[in-house]
Amino acid sequence: MPKVSEDHLAARRRQILDGARRCFAEYGYDKATVRRLEQAIGMSRGAIFHHFRDKDALFFALAREDTERMAAVASREGLIGVMRDMLAAPDQFDWLATRLEIARKLRNDPDFSRGWAERSAELAAATTDRLRRQKQANRVRDDVPSDVLRCYLDLVLDGLLARLASGEDPQRLAAVLDLVENSVRRS
């Protein structure tokens, strides 16, 4: 059997992830069946699951990519910066509109819940660290505990995703983010 190059494997993996992102965005997590994933990706289930153990692993790979990117932005610009990136390029985050399905699955599937918690920890850590640095620099309110501020920003993120998914005007949402940012800044 001919040896497949690392570049070829990486390109196939990228094709799988890009197709899966589109499929999850269009159908949501639960309705993104293996057949729909095959159609969106343009590969057989054997080819897809050669690279990813199962649908959860594929979904978590997307979550890992986005979490790493979001954590890097959150470290530099805070969670508000992440949300501004989402408004600037909503098509890059449209699959995250599945968060309502994810919330239900988190309550009912312990394995999924553990996997999701692992993927979310990096973004939470970056946000917490950014808030700590901003408090030390006297830029963020000190009358509210950091964990409460992070929870507040997480709630705003969830709402932003829901509004983007329902077609809300990104400019209006940007104005809301200005309000949120001012609410956490030190006066």
UniProtKB/Swiss-Prot annotation:
Give coiled-coil spans as residue ranges: none
Does the record's keyword annotation contain RNA-binding?
no
Regulation (activators, inhibitors)? Binding to DNA is abolished in the presence of high concentration of iron. Specifically binds to tetracycline, which leads to a conformational change in the structure of the protein and inhibits the DNA binding activity.
Check the record and name the InterPro entries matching this protein.
Homeodomain-like_sf, HTH-type_TetR-like_transc_reg, HTH_TetR, Tet_transcr_reg_TetR-rel_C_sf
Gene3D superfamilies linked: Tetracycline Repressor, domain 2
Q: Which UniProt keywords apply?
A: DNA-binding, Repressor, Transcription, Transcription regulation
Record GO biological process: regulation of DNA-templated transcription
Q: Which residues bind DNA?
A: 33-52
Residues in HTH tetR-type domain copies: 10-70
Record-linked SUPFAM superfamilies: Homeodomain-like, Tetracyclin repressor-like, C-terminal domain
- Please report what switches on or represses expression of this protein: Negatively autoregulated.
Q: Which superkingdom does the taxonomy of this entry point to?
A: Bacteria
Name the GO cellular-component terms.
Answer: peptidoglycan-based cell wall
PANTHER family per the UniProt record, alphabetical = HTH-TYPE TRANSCRIPTIONAL REGULATOR RUTR, HTH-TYPE TRANSCRIPTIONAL REPRESSOR RV1474C
Q: What does this protein do?
A: Represses the expression of the aconitase gene acn and its own expression, in an iron-responsive manner. Binds to the inverted repeat element present in the upstream region of acn (Rv1475c)-Rv1474c operon. Preferentially binds to major groove of the DNA.
Q: Describe the subunit structure.
A: Homodimer.
From the Swiss-Prot or TrEMBL record, give the protein name.
HTH-type transcriptional repressor Rv1474c
Query: What is the originating organism of this protein?
Result: Mycobacterium tuberculosis (strain ATCC 25618 / H37Rv)
Q: What is the lineage of its organism?
A: Bacteria, Bacillati, Actinomycetota, Actinomycetes, Mycobacteriales
